A protein has these predicted regions:
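Acidic, His- and aromatic-enriched active-site or binding-groove loops in soluble protein domains
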Residues: 127-145
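Non-heme Fe(II)-dependent double-stranded beta-helix
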Residues: 2-10, 17-129
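Double-stranded beta-helix
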Residues: 155-213
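A structural signal for short, well-ordered beta-strand segments and their strand-loop junctions
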Residues: 15-17, 108-112, 161-164, 209
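A short catalytic or substrate-binding loop motif that flags glycine-/basic-rich loops and adjacent residues
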Residues: 107, 140-144, 155-156
């Protein structure tokens, strides 16, 4: 795993192909399906939808449920994730081993874990260029953090995948501006570096780790 740590330190991120076993990922997807079941049943009871779309595949069901009601689409699941279906991923042995290599043996899971559904043509799910540290204090770069992202469906340039600017973490915490839904890095930092931005296309089972900077 040392080459992963090297990529993380050098680029600010690292891609881990086929890192999460299918059984673990399936358990997470089933937990998400339960959350969507609950949403669908509530929408049906409220008369917002006339069918539950229960036979639609995992990757399409939320699109069907909210296609005509984008304003009701959840943009994030966070407190809902305190469920056993997610625990095996949170405490995945390979992720913990990697975290120890990156952060040292004293580690903690920051209680900000989330699932973000991304629906087509919904600006509330189009996350802008930012540093996670931009949402916290400016001196947070004194803390070493490792974020982990695991896709549940294929993520590519067409449907919207993660993007990174390699080595931009070396800038430390930079200025951000509040846009309608999210923070965005100030153009004085962003514009001169956009030429080096890369798309990170991933498949279920892959993982991406990245700096909060």
């Amino acid at each position: 795993m040392l080459h992963i740590v090297d990529d993380f330190d050098r680029q600010g991120f690292a891609v881990l192909p086929n890192f999460i076993e299918s059984d673990c990922l399936q358990q997470v997807k089933e937990g998400c399906q339960q959350l969507v079941d609950n949403l669908a049943e509530q929408l049906y009871r409220d008369g917002v939808i006339s069918e539950l779309y229960s036979t639609e595949p995992f990757a399409r069901r939320m699109i069907c449920l909210f296609a005509s009601h984008l304003d009701k689409t959840p943009t994030i699941f966070r407190p809902e994730l305190h469920l056993p279906a997610f625990y095996d991923l949170f405490a995945h042995p390979k992720l913990l081993d990697l975290a120890k290599l990156v952060l040292g043996t004293e580690i903690r899971l920051y209680p900000n874990y989330s699932v973000r559904p991304k629906l087509p043509n919904d600006p509330r799910t189009e996350v802008l260029w930012h540093q996670d540290a931009g949402y916290t204090r400016t001196d947070v770069d004194a803390l070493r953090m490792m974020n982990v992202w695991v896709p549940l469906v294929p993520a590519n340039e067409e449907n919207g995948c993660m993007q990174f600017i390699p080595e931009s973490h070396r800038l430390g915490v930079v200025g951000h501006q509040k846009e309608e839904f999210y923070l965005q890095i100030d153009q004085e930092y962003l514009a001169p570096r956009m030429y080096s931005a890369i798309q990170i296309e991933t498949m279920p089972g892959d993982a991406v780790i990245f700096s909060n900077l």
